[in-house]
């Protein structure tokens, strides 16, 4: 198995700590006036999204995580797992509801998502930054009603709820930022 020295640490590097795949979020090299240099590293656990801080002595090496990222198309839900298919190899990946997490509310048939595999098993799904979804339910916007916050809740075809401007109506397709769960714009046909 490959390993990385602390000299090679940088943001985005995937390493194995106590059997858990981690990604380096921040790396700070510290050389005190007295004593040995060290790296203060902020790590994000890929299995549960927890962020931890850890220090490594300069020159120490850690094992590389067997993490692979690939794009796959969402096909269908089969009762207990979501099925994604690689567009070129047609290999299917069964993804559990735990691994899917918050991405579930952005799932749309035949859209492409990024799958993160650890030892060949899907551990996380990343939705595209923006998705186009249909509004299935929202209150009608009353003309001249601008006294409030300037928005109203709208339920989308996937079940997600986002705040939209008053002029947006049921049946319209809108663009949503999946990172912040916010309305971006209406989609023109």
Swiss-Prot record:
What SUPFAM superfamilies does this protein's entry cite?
Nucleic acid-binding proteins (SSF50249), Translation proteins SH3-like domain (SSF50104)
Q: Which PANTHER family match?
A: ELONGATION FACTOR P, ELONGATION FACTOR P (EF-P) FAMILY PROTEIN
Locate the N6-(3,6-diaminohexanoyl)-5-hydroxylysine modifications and list their residues: 34
Mod. after translation: May be beta-lysylated on the epsilon-amino group of Lys-34 by the combined action of EpmA and EpmB, and then hydroxylated on the C5 position of the same residue by EpmC (if this protein is present). Lysylation is critical for the stimulatory effect of EF-P on peptide-bond formation. The lysylation moiety may extend toward the peptidyltransferase center and stabilize the terminal 3-CCA end of the tRNA. Hydroxylation of the C5 position on Lys-34 may allow additional potential stabilizing hydrogen-bond interactions with the P-tRNA.
Q: Which Pfam families match?
A: EFP, EFP_N, Elong-fact-P_C
GO CC term, one of those recorded = cytoplasm
Q: What is this protein called?
A: Elongation factor P
NCBIfam families recorded for this chain?
efp (TIGR00038), PRK00529.1 (NF001810)
**Gene3D superfamilies under this entry?**
2.30.30.30, Nucleic acid-binding proteins
Native source organism of the sequence: Francisella philomiragia subsp. philomiragia (strain ATCC 25017 / CCUG 19701 / FSC 153 / O#319-036)
Q: Known InterPro entries for this protein?
A: Elong-fact-P_C, NA-bd_OB-fold, Rib_uL2_dom2, Transl_elong_fac_P/YeiP, Transl_elong_KOW-like, Transl_elong_P/YeiP_cen, Transl_elong_P/YeiP_CS, Transl_elongation_fac_P
The entry's localization annotation reads: Cytoplasm
Which UniProt keywords are listed?
Cytoplasm, Elongation factor, Hydroxylation, Protein biosynthesis
This protein's pathway reads: Protein biosynthesis; polypeptide chain elongation
Q: What does this protein do?
A: Involved in peptide bond synthesis. Alleviates ribosome stalling that occurs when 3 or more consecutive Pro residues or the sequence PPG is present in a protein, possibly by augmenting the peptidyl transferase activity of the ribosome. Modification of Lys-34 is required for alleviation.
Q: What is its main location?
A: cytoplasm
Q: Which residues form a coiled coil?
A: none
* Assigned protein family: Belongs to the elongation factor P family.
Molecular function (GO) terms listed?
A: translation elongation factor activity
User: GO biological process annotations for this chain's record?
Assistant: peptide biosynthetic process
